[in-house]
Amino acid sequence: MLPFDAGAMFAALAHYHATFWPLQWLALAWGVATLGAAASGFSRTALLLLAAASIWVGAAWHIATFAQLNFAAPIYGALFVVEGAVLAWVAARGRVALRFRRRARDWVGLSVAVAALVGYPLVDRLSGVPWPAVRLPGAAPCPTALFALGILLLAGGRSAAGLMVLPALWTVAAGATGWVLAIGHDQLLPVAGVAALALALRPEPRVRS
């Protein structure tokens, strides 16, 4: 059992968005900018934008807001902040190259990122969540983790997979929470998280000369 229900969580989200208005609109713009930067090969910019969002969600949502309802929120928040710090460090080193190369992995990554940016808030709304509480990547943890997994698939390989571990772990925790709260689309997150991580680790097919 959790110390809150779905109604309390979405009420907290609405309060959070109102406190930092116009956060939802800024998150939408952030998502478009990050997706464009990653697909175009501006790896450092995209990684820094992901880092900023992860730190923001960890500090502003989990630690400053959600901790009032969930005793585990500060732990989750710390993990998001750590993920953001690692992303920023990797961006500074320039070791991970993001680019849309029309590989199967890239199409999946692009689809996952778009699903997080457009599909997640849309399904929230169609599920009866009022607009002030609708979750978007860059502002709320579930779509932020899903969006990050999609963006990082544009790199693939073990270096990108290492960056995907914490977001993938979050999808498992969020899926369990979604099951308890009866939020259907949250329950699918572990499948997406594990599949994205496995795809990142899958070797690229060799091109025959």
Protein language model regions, located:
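Aromatic-anchored segments of alpha-helical transmembrane domains
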Residues: 52-60, 112-123, 168-179
